[in-house]
Regions:
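GIY-YIG nuclease catalytic motif and its immediate N-terminal context
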Residues: 1-111, 149-163
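Surface-exposed loop/turn and secondary-structure junction residues enriched for glycine/proline
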Residues: 19, 115, 119, 123-124, ...
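Surface-exposed polar/charged interaction patches
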Residues: 19-22, 26, 122, 136-139
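GIY-YIG-like beta-to-alpha core
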Residues: 69, 100-135
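C-terminal or late-domain output modules
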Residues: 126-178
Length: 178
């Protein structure tokens, strides 16, 4: 019986991997901490996977220079050990070129609007794990892009983490827990 279940599970993983390869993010908006009016909060009361990209501001000639400057800002001592995700060196190594948009963070949520709100507005002192972008004075002038994949699913807790991992391995966001 266990072997039969294991074989079915292996087949499902294969099908989910193939499904994840077909998924495309829908761009929702660009925003900055100085202008959050572009975020359509009411349209984000959905479940699925979200991606936050950061815009390359054109001041750097290559990715290593850009990431070194970004790392200095992100890892500033005032923001360390504050329940925020870290820069992932193994994912940075997957980026060779400086693109217009750099994948910053990838996550999943049963209510994307609430989770994005936390990533932006959660205070640095709070223990909720989030980007806490608004609290970071040294990156307030950056431009971000929010994209989503809406996935309504009664088996969310089983399926979405697997799909999220596949997308994370494909996109390699530079910040995260994994």
């Amino acid at each position: 019986m266990f072997e039969e279940i294991n074989n079915k599970f292996t087949q499902l993983k294969t099908e989910l991997s193939e499904f994840a390869e077909t998924l495309e993010f829908t761009e929702i908006c660009e925003f900055s901490m100085n202008d959050l009016s572009q975020i359509p909060w009411d349209n984000l009361n959905i479940s699925g996977i979200y991606k936050i990209d950061i815009k390359n501001n054109g001041l750097y000639s290559d990715f290593p220079n850009w990431i070194n400057t970004f790392r200095e800002k992100w890892e500033d001592l005032q923001y360390k050990r504050k329940f925020v995700p870290n820069i992932k060196t193994k994912r940075i190594k997957m980026h060779n070129e400086l693109q217009e948009w750099i994948p910053l963070y990838l996550g999943k949520s049963k209510k994307i609007s609430s989770r994005i709100h936390q990533h932006i507005f959660k205070e640095m002192e709070k223990t909720t794990f989030a980007l806490k972008l608004y609290a970071r004075e040294n990156i307030k002038d950056e431009t971000y892009k929010l994209s989503i994949i809406e996935i309504q699913n009664e088996n969310y807790d089983f399926i979405i983490p697997f799909v999220e991992k596949k997308l994370r391995d494909k996109i390699n966001p530079i910040i995260g827990k994994q």
